Amino acid sequence: SNGGENADGFAIKLHSGIGNILENCVADNNSDDGYDCYAAHGAITFKRCQANYNGNCYGIKGDGNGFKLGGVDNKTSGVKPHLDPLNHVLTNCSAKGNTGSGFDRNNQNGVVTMTNCTGDSNKKYNYNWPAKGKPSALGYEVTFGRAKIVNSTSINGKNNISGADLIGKCNG
């Protein structure tokens, strides 16, 4: 058993197709992540999506990120570990009350743009966007492309945004 891992609300991961657009989607109360883009192969567009209270479903616990926006693929048999730099776009999205981070880089090395987004009361960070990653399955520390956080808000939580540029009116 893997606890609550991989019980995501929306799993656009592990070699998913390109051109995925999610609009007006809600991912609430999943034991793992609300939206998981681990090892996706194409940039994903999110419009007006919500991720709330993920990471603990009736005591079954996973990572608990609202939007997990990257990751290295080192688990697929026959596929060499790799990081795909993907330029995901999130517009008018919100993440509230997740046990992990609301918006989590998870080793995404593309330039992700988050516009008019809100992180509220997420346990780890509202925005978790460090400049560098831990040594990965590839065996080296990853230096990332910088995220763009545009006209966005952080409420009742902390942020790790050394790998992001704040543009326009950002609060919190």
Where are these regions (language model features)?
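Low-complexity, intrinsically disordered or weakly predicted helical/coil tracts enriched
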Residues: 18-19, 52, 102
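Residues on the solvent-exposed faces and adjacent turns
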Residues: 14, 24, 29, 39, ...
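A compositionally biased, intrinsically disordered/low-complexity signal enriched
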Residues: 25, 35, 43, 89, ...
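Gram-negative outer-membrane beta-barrel proteins
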Residues: 55-57
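All-beta strand scaffolds that present successive hydrophobic residues in beta-strands
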Residues: 19-23, 43-49, 76, 85-93, ...
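Extracellular beta-strand/beta-solenoid scaffold signature
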Residues: 1-15, 29-38, 59-81, 97-106, ...
